[in-house]
C-alpha cells in the first residue's frame, strides 16, 4: 500500500467509477459550520463562502486531508429564491473555494444543487427548472468537474434537476433524501432509481435524512429496481453521521432532537468503517457522508477502503488503525484497547442514564 498522502492522477468521475475505483466523497457543511458559528440554523444558507471564506476553505482542506476524492461546492440552497441578489456571488465564491483547495490534492469539484422550497407549493416545472439553470450557468462558467443534484424528497423534482444539469454535458449525479418507504409521493426507492436513470443520471443514490444502516437498506432497493428494469447507473451513498433507526418517513428532521440535540446519536469512526465496508460490498463505489459527518468520519471511510484504493489519506499519519496507537499508553487497560476486536464490539454508553435509546418522531 502506498504511504499516507499519496494521490492519484486527476481522472474524471466516470472514468474512475467505470474502472471500478472507490471514490470517497466529502460531507455536509451545514451542521459542521453551524457548530463552528458560521451558518445560521433554520435558514441553512451558505453565505459563509462570502462572509467567512477562510472557514469554508478550512473545512474543504480538512475533508481533502481526510481522504475525500470529491469536494462539493458549498451551494446548498444557494438559489435565487432563497438568497435574492446574493445568489450569484455565493455560487461563484463557492466554486472558487472548492477549486482552490481541490487543486492542491488532485480532487474533483462537484457543483451542487438541491430541492427547492417552491416545489411543495407550486409544482411549476418551468419556473423550478429556471432556478436550477441559474446555478448551472455559474457552475459551467467555473468549469466544475461534474454536477450533483442532492437532497430531493420528491422524485419528480429530482428528474427535473437531472434534465437541467444534463444540458451542459458534464457527468450528473443525483441523490434523494429518502428511506426505504420511498419519496413523499410514495414512489418506491426502486421506482425512483429507474426514473432518475431514464432521465439520464450517471450516478444515483441517497444522501442525508437517514443514518448509515437505513441508507444502505434504501440503496439495496434502488439497486434492485435498476436491475429489474435492466438499467445501469453507478451508485453513491452519503448518509447522516447520526444513528436514526427511529426515524419515520421524513427522516431525522422529524425527530425531537433535530437540530440541536443530536450529539448523543453521533456515529463513531468505527461505525463508519463498517458502513463503508457494507456499502462497498453492496456494490456502491461512491461513498461519503452528509450532516453529522466530520472529517474524521471521512478518514474512516478512506482507511477502511485503503486496501481497495491502494493508499491511505494524509490524515492517517496521525491515526493508528483500529486504535493501534494506544499500544504505547502507560495504562495497561488502555493498551488493551489497541485492537480491532475491542472497537468493533464496543457498545458505547451515552452517559445519560435517564434518556431513552429511541425517540418518537413528531411527524
UniProtKB/Swiss-Prot annotation:
Molecular functions (GO terms): S-adenosylmethionine-homocysteine S-methyltransferase activity; S-methylmethionine-homocysteine S-methyltransferase activity; zinc ion binding
Cofactor remark from the record: Binds 1 zinc ion per subunit.
Domain of life: Eukaryota
GO biological process, one term: L-methionine salvage
Cofactor(s) for this UniProt protein: Zn(2+)
Residues carrying Phosphoserine: 321
EC number: 2.1.1.10
Catalyzed reaction equations: S-methyl-L-methionine + L-homocysteine = 2 L-methionine + H(+)
Pfam families: S-methyl_trans
Keyword tags: Metal-binding, Methyltransferase, Phosphoprotein, Transferase, Zinc
Subunit structure and binding partners: Homotetramer.
Name of this chain's protein: S-methylmethionine--homocysteine S-methyltransferase BHMT2
Organism: Mus musculus
The encoding gene: Bhmt2
Amino acid at each position: 500500500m502506498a504511504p499516507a498522502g499519496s494521490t492519484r492522477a486527476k481522472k474524471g468521475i466516470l472514468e474512475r467509477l467505470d474502472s471500478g475505483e472507490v471514490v470517497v466523497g466529502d460531507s455536509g457543511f451545514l451542521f459542521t459550520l453551524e457548530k463552528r458559528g458560521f451558518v445560521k440554523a433554520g435558514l441553512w444558507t451558505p453565505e459563509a463562502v462570502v462572509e467567512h471564506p477562510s472557514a469554508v476553505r478550512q473545512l474543504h482542506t480538512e475533508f481533502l486531508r481526510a481522504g475525500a476524492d470529491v469536494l462539493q461546492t458549498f451551494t446548498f440552497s444557494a438559489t435565487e429564491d432563497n438568497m435574492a441578489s446574493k445568489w450569484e456571488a455565493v455560487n461563484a465564491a463557492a466554486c472558487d473555494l472548492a477549486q482552490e483547495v481541490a487543486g492542491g490534492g488532485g480532487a474533483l469539484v462537484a457543483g451542487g444543487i438541491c430541492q427547492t422550497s417552491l416545489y411543495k407549493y407550486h409544482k411549476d416545472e418551468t419556473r423550478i427548472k429556471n432556478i436550477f439553470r441559474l446555478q448551472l450557468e455559474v457552475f459551467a462558467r467555473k468549469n466544475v468537474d461534474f454536477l450533483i443534484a442532492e437532497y430531493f424528497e420528491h422524485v419528480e423534482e429530482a428528474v427535473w434537476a437531472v434534465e437541467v444539469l444534463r444540458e451542459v454535458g458534464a457527468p450528473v449525479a443525483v441523490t434523494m433524501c429518502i428511506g426505504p418507504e420511498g419519496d413523499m409521493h410514495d414512489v418506491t426507492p426502486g421506482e425512483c432509481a429507474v426514473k432518475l436513470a431514464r432521465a439520464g443520471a450517471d450516478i444515483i443514490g441517497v444522501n442525508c435524512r437517514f443514518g448509515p444502516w437505513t441508507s444502505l437498506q434504501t440503496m439495496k432497493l434502488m439497486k434492485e429496481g435498476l436491475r429489474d428494469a435492466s438499467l445501469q447507473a453507478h451508485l453513491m451513498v452519503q448518509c447522516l453521521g447520526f444513528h436514526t433507526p427511529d426515524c419515520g418517513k421524513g427522516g431525522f428532521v422529524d425527530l425531537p432532537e433535530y437540530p440541536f440535540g443530536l450529539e448523543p446519536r453521533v456515529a463513531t469512526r468505527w461505525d463508519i468503517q463498517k458502513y463503508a465496508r457494507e456499502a462497498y460490498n453492496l456494490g456502491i463505489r461512491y461513498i461519503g457522508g452528509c450532516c453529522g459527518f466530520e472529517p474524521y468520519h471521512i478518514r474512516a471511510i478512506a482507511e477502511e477502503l485503503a486496501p481497495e484504493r491502494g493508499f491511505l489519506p494524509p490524515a492517517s499519519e496521525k491515526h493508528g488503525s483500529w486504535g493501534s496507537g494506544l499500544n504505547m499508553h502507560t495504562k495497561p487497560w488502555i493498551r488493551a484497547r489497541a485492537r480491532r476486536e475491542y472497537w468493533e464490539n464496543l457498545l458505547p454508553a451515552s452517559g445519560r442514564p435517564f434518556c431513552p435509546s429511541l425517540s418518537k418522531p413528531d411527524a
